[in-house]
Amino acid sequence: VTIEASTVKGVFWGTRTLLQMIHNQPFGLMKGKALDYPQYAHRGLMIDVARKFFTMDYLQDYVKILSFYKMNELQIHLNDNGFVEFFDNDWNKTYAAFRLESDRFPGLTSKDGSYTKEEFRNFQQMAARYGINIIPEIDVPAHSLAFTHYNPILAADKKEYGMDHLDLYKKEVYDFLDTLFDEYLSGDHPVFV
């Protein structure tokens, strides 16, 4: 068996094609030539780890499955909240989660499941070895109840938008977001690689 491609990544995807052929022909490969290339540059999915926590082991296994099917992007939805209607119309009772460790905002990280910065860095590196680009998503200005539970001053008017919206007229919101994003994007060893 010979796999040829114009890039290293192309050779890797060729190994996925070979694995699929072996899976579909368990009694041996037929003699011949196969030509395979993606129709779309971006082939991915999004997983909501905010509303439903998934362990790092699960995410790593998921990356391997995506790689087998030659997907190349996985968006990780790191923060979100439930719907106030399901929590007695009380924003203070409404479930909210932020799944990534934060040193700059102690207490922001969800207690019912989260990832350390080092785990998330390692996960992105592992995914890259399988041809998957991890796209971390911090959802703002809506779906931000975890942030407004942490600091209620960040919330928009509850009547017009709901407490899960950040008030974009407040300087405190921009200070908070600048600090939060800087924690994950800056430095010699950023969390989002």
Give, region by region, the residue ranges found by the protein language model.
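Feature activates predominantly on carbohydrate-active enzymes
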Residues: T2-V193
